[in-house]
Amino acid sequence: MGILGQGNYSLTAGIIPDRVPYPLLENHLGNNFIFYNTNSFNMMRFFEFTSNRFFSLQYTQYLEGLITNRLPIIKKLNWRNHFTFNYLIGDLEERFNTNGALNSLNGKPYIEIGYGFSNIFRFLRVDFVHRLTHLNNTSTVFESNPPKFSIKISAQIRL
């Protein structure tokens, strides 16, 4: 992307047409830990949403110093900033949820955005992640609302 750095994306879609046992449905990957996971929805709780039809987009834009090089201290430390965008839409047909215990997106998108710094001590990464939708998501499994904001850390080596 030239001056904007490098972008990475992941598209996933799926349809489960026939009735199957619960473990074979799509249980979207959540992350309750303090560690950032590039392959999960980092503000979603484990087993929070289940779908038989879904589409997801996960996008990360590495700005390669576009903003941080304008700040002398950050430039000297060689930190890099990045932005993330995670989108998921899905649905669970009633025939898959006969007892009503499964929580579905019901066609309403799940969105989270994040920003952060990487290359801290050459391998650490810190992400600030915000959950934008499904903020009041209580069910029989979860008694409280999910968090709206979290700070996640991870280790990565980008050559």
Stretch-by-stretch model annotation:
Residues 1-159:
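Exposed, low-structure sequence patches enriched in small/polar residues
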